[in-house]
Amino acid sequence: MAGLGAALFAVSALLLKTGAVSWDVSLFRVLNEVPAALVPVLTLLSRLASPVGIIAVVALTLIYVVARNRSVLPVTAGAVAAGAALVLSHVAKALADRPRPYEVVAGAVLRQQPAHGTSFPSAHTAVTVAVVIALVPFLPQTLAAVAIAYAVLVGCSRVYLGVHYPLDVLGGAGIGMAVGGVILLALGVLLHRAPAGAAGRAPEPRENSPATG
């Protein structure tokens, strides 16, 4: 998982650096012009994936974990994943220095207040993907499916709102996958080394989860 994420980010950054982005602008136009009825839903999704939204999600997850007498380790992992993905995204933004699409693409529709910082990669996507990957193995299958769908929709919403290109979302997803994968590896080591008495308090990742990636 971590290696795949790193590769996805590297390819995205290489495409941006070499200027092979004509497809990116074309796809941006398609996703930026979807029906206006989706504005409230996609705007809400992006707000839920903001730093404040992530804190709220982690807090709610903590309540969920405590209510079921489970370990807080997965919640801690989610918080670490969010912080690491956010920092790495802003470092990459400073290096790439790509203008936002609404600043340079003729006819681009901006459906929110102008965003701060540069475009590549999408920090919203990076944080969301990192947290979802870190927490999905510890969630019931239904909630895990919802979480994965949420991460995908957040990425799409950033393009629809006019603040990111699709390539920015792919780069952010790569960072999120890399960070989330490292967190899962660390969790695997911690759970494997946990004393027998503590094993019952920390849920093992499901066998069909990406924890072994």
What positions do the PLM features span?
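Interfacial segments of alpha-helical transmembrane regions
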Residues: 1-2, 60-88
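N-terminal transmembrane-helix/juxtamembrane module of multi-pass inner/ER membrane proteins
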Residues: 1-54, 93-114, 210-213
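Aromatic-anchored segments of alpha-helical transmembrane domains
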Residues: 9-11, 83-90, 151-163
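Transmembrane helix-loop junctions in multipass membrane proteins, especially transporters and channels
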Residues: 18-20, 69-73, 94-102, 163-167, ...
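Membrane-helix interface segments
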Residues: 37-38, 70-75, 139-145
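Hydrophobic alpha-helical transmembrane segments
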Residues: 46-68
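Hydrophobic, lipid-facing residues on alpha-helical transmembrane segments of integral membrane proteins
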Residues: 79-91, 174, 178, 182
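Membrane-embedded catalytic cores of phosphoryl/pyrophosphoryl-handling enzymes
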Residues: 106-213
